[in-house]
Amino acid sequence: GSHDWRDLMAVKERIHLLQDTDDDGKADVAKVFAEGFNQEVNGVMAGVLPYRGDVFATIYPDVWKLNDTDQDGYADKQEVFIHGFGVHAAFDGHDLHGLTIGPDGKLYFSVGDNGFSVRTREGKLLHHPNTGGVLRCNWDGSNLEVFATGLRNVQELAFDEFGNLFSVDNDGDIREERERFVYITEGSDSGWRLNWQFKKGGWPRQTQTPEYCPWIDEKLWLPHWKGQAAYITPPMSEFSVGPGGFKYNPGTALNGRYKNSFFLCEFPVQKVTAFKTEPQGAYFKMVDEHIFLFGMMASAINFSPDGSLYVANWDGKWQPNELGSIWVVDDPAIRRSEKRKQVAELLRSNFARHADAFLIQLLANEDQRIRLEAQFELARRDKFEELLKVASNPNAKQLARVHALWGLGQLEDNSQRDKRLARRLPFTDSDFEIR
């Protein structure tokens, strides 16, 4: 694009559909599910999420919704789901990504510091042109809202089993600081603004402005310290080089060693790091950090229904090529265990066909993905009394109670029910995750 703006349209974005039809661990069917998205204003396709027959994709300046209506493996219906991201022409890749399912049943995604100015379907303007953040909405695009701001460019989002949202944010490309492990709470501001980047290095000479950068000079980027600005939510720790794919073990993946573990791709240094968190006051601290995988430029990761870890290898570094590959990482000792088979079978099943009683049982399942789908289906059926019974039962499994509470939160407002909730919700429960 430096010589001819039409160069920006030369490379198409693609979504590939890969299938292992004979269960030998290798993809034997490959189709281009969708391609194009190569107008001069388009960014990279940095996020893809298939869910309940729809495929959502983040392609700056839009979030797209794709459908294969005739089941032939190709997206024959494509529509702009949300528009208005990328106010600035900032760094490539600082746009849209991180599509994931929240514990409240909403669609979450992250926005880089190219910023956004989005008009919601209800007519409200969400205007944050100089920073990144996290947004969420219903699956029909309604009730789009800003969940958090002040982030530079978190690539992917991961919820732990208690609904705490974490990510790893990119640094500001300023010599004095580095990437950060962040705890993202609703309404939080992590402090970053796009213009901070142009307050250090050679930029002040170019812009003829004083070299003063609040991000560095006011130590906004550092983990909590005495005297830190009170309006920001600081990072938990300095961490990583070039964060990319980020996922949390759903509970039955890999083996017991990696239960409750996060996995982060650090593609410039060719490694995937694993770690866990422990509560520390109102915050968390990182523990058990170590290299999980080394030697490939891993850009994205995800857990399959059978519990193995898929790793996308971005071979060739920054230049477009056809050397990329997808690898499978697993523990061969338990890869085909009965538990793994049961989880995969349940995830393939139609939760709308399961009985209420069975869904209640699944709220205590070891796998986070199954618990969430059971919760969502009970909420869809408006099973108020059943969910309240589990939530208020001190003898029920902890995670079943957590999901029952989330399910209650998904139900429509009802003043009569609110009175019953006020009497029966476990506000004084001995478990702080419940009360």
Residue ranges and their predicted role:
Residues 1-358, 373, 377:
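Beta-propeller domains with acidic blade repeats across secreted/periplasmic ectodomains
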Residues 58, 102, 160, 304, ...:
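Residue-level signal for short amphipathic helical patches enriched in basic/charged
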Residues 68, 415-417:
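Structural helix-adjacent loops and short alpha-helical linkers that scaffold large soluble proteins
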Residues 341-351, 368-381, 399-414, 421-427, ...:
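Structural detector for internal amphipathic alpha-helices that build alpha-solenoid repeat scaffolds
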Residues 356, 384, 418-419:
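Core helices of alpha-solenoid repeat scaffolds
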Residues 360-372, 376-377, 381-384, 388-392:
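Periplasmic c-type cytochrome electron-transfer domains
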Residues 361-362, 388-395, 421-430:
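Alpha-solenoid HEAT/Armadillo-like helical repeat scaffolds in large eukaryotic proteins
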